[in-house]
């Protein structure tokens, strides 16, 4: 009996500093401008992976979303992450190497424009947690600018690159602040994309909408509209959010 308890303890994730410990992997982010946050976790837990065979994460940062998709998807699924900022790309590579899915995830330190022009593969699932601040007021940190501000990757450019890289019936999924999500969907429609799913997110019931998850496709079809509150009125995580994160967050 003691031996069994000991074996169980060995399997428990080891909590470490400089990053975020999930049930099956650790994401170091101390060298990344943008840290692990709810936006990335939402996208990684939500995107439809059932029919995916080749996945692309544009602006992969620490590798968080790529790792979450690897955990959720079939063993034969191959995942590419593209990251412009050298330190973040290096850290993403390290996170991947230490994960259970090192053979399935490949990190490319490259500009997405060059990647889109030269990469031979197309993807049936593309994901991105893109920059969303206008470049009017820059940060002091150039790497943080790259991660946060659209000057390095405009939404127009993101849509154009995704169009070049997606399969005919592929899905393109993003997470954005709600107001920008509305604008992103409008811009996508002008470029021939169709919204197939939209999730409007608020922190808790009665609070303003603050995030949006979008699934876009080049193929027309029914649009599914959903709502998600991250917390209940008393402040605890909602059952719907717990269901999303239960395979990832410790103690859920």
Swiss-Prot record:
A single GO cellular-component term on record: cytoplasm
EC class of the enzyme, as a word: transferase
Chief place where the protein resides: cytoplasm
Organism ancestry: Bacteria, Pseudomonadati, Pseudomonadota, Gammaproteobacteria, Enterobacterales
Transmembrane segments: none
GO molecular function: nucleic acid binding; tRNA (adenine-N6)-methyltransferase activity
InterPro entries registered for this protein in UniProt: DNA_methylase_N6_adenine_CS, SAM-dependent_MTases_sf, Small_mtfrase_dom, tRNA_Adenine-N(6)_MTase, tRNA_adenine-N6_MeTrfase
Domain of life: Bacteria
Compartment annotation: Cytoplasm
Name recorded for this polypeptide: tRNA1(Val) (adenine(37)-N6)-methyltransferase
One Pfam family, short name: MTS
CDD domains in the record: AdoMet_MTases
Species this protein is from: Yersinia pseudotuberculosis serotype O:3 (strain YPIII)
PROSITE patterns documented for this protein: N6_MTASE
Reaction catalysed by this enzyme: adenosine(37) in tRNA1(Val) + S-adenosyl-L-methionine = N(6)-methyladenosine(37) in tRNA1(Val) + S-adenosyl-L-homocysteine + H(+)
A single GO BP: tRNA processing
Assigned keywords, A-Z: Cytoplasm, Methyltransferase, S-adenosyl-L-methionine, Transferase, tRNA processing
Function per UniProt: Specifically methylates the adenine in position 37 of tRNA(1)(Val) (anticodon cmo5UAC).
EC number(s) on file: 2.1.1.223
Keyword DNA-binding in record: no
Family, per entry: Belongs to the methyltransferase superfamily. tRNA (adenine-N(6)-)-methyltransferase family.
């Amino acid at each position: 009996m003691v031996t069994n308890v000991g074996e169980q303890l060995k399997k428990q994730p080891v909590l470490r500093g400089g990053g975020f410990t999930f049930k099956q992997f650790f994401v170091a982010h101390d060298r990344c401008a943008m840290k692990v946050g709810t936006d990335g976790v939402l996208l990684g837990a939500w995107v439809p992976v059932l029919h995916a065979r080749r996945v692309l994460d544009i602006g992969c940062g620490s590798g968080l979303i790529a790792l979450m998709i690897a955990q959720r998807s079939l063993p034969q699924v191959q995942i590419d992450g593209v990251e412009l900022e050298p330190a973040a790309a290096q850290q993403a590579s390290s996170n991947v190497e230490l994960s259970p899915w090192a053979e399935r995830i490949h990190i490319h330190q490259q500009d997405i424009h060059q990647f889109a022009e030269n990469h031979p593969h197309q993807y049936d699932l593309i994901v991105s947690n893109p920059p969303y601040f206008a470049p009017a007021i820059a940060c002091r940190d150039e790497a943080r600018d790259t991660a946060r501000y659209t000057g390095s990757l405009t939404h127009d450019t993101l849509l154009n690159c995704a169009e070049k890289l997606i399969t005919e019936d592929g899905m393109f999924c993003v997470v954005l602040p709600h107001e920008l999500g509305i604008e992103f969907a409008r811009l996508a429609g002008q470029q021939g994309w169709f919204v197939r799913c939209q999730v409007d997110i608020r922190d808790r019931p009665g609070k303003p909408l603050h995030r949006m998850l979008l699934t876009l496709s080049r193929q027309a079809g029914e649009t599914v509209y959903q709502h998600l509150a991250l917390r209940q009125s008393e402040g605890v995580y909602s059952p719907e959010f717990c269901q999303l994160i239960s395979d990832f967050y410790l103690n859920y």
